[in-house]
């Protein structure tokens, strides 16, 4: 479908606005995936706080210009589906990774996080980032274990002191 200049400008403005508030971006090729499967992916994306859109490569290059996602420019070849994680940096990567497992034709091209390009082979780095709640739980369990260990060492020192006396 041919887009006039105003439509192109509107697309660039909309996606640029989303990119400004995004934590990470993931680029994929969805050729060969059925419409039903893509609809499921979009629904799961909305629930996970992920903005997804198929955008022409020339327009996408304009969108990422001057942003932390500029490193993705070289991956804009062929049909490009871009997903921006709005709430958690690993949300889009996790979503695409799970979807790619179930759909062989879906191919993750690359991701970007804090200005760093993450190739498709290393997408797990981003997908396995813990959520805020998970990170907090890990920290609390580590602190709890450290306190218990200190108590045990203190009691052992008191016991040793009593035995020596």
Swiss-Prot record:
Cystine pairs: none
Cellular component aspect of the GO annotation: large ribosomal subunit
Origin superkingdom: Bacteria
GO biological process per UniProt: translation
Recorded family membership: Belongs to the universal ribosomal protein uL10 family.
Oligomeric form and interacting partners: Part of the ribosomal stalk of the 50S ribosomal subunit. The N-terminus interacts with L11 and the large rRNA to form the base of the stalk. The C-terminus forms an elongated spine to which L12 dimers bind in a sequential fashion forming a multimeric L10(L12)X complex.
The protein's name: Large ribosomal subunit protein uL10
Described purpose of this protein according to its UniProt entry: Forms part of the ribosomal stalk, playing a central role in the interaction of the ribosome with GTP-bound translation factors.
Gene Ontology terms, MF aspect: large ribosomal subunit rRNA binding; structural constituent of ribosome
Keywords assigned: Ribonucleoprotein, Ribosomal protein, RNA-binding, rRNA-binding
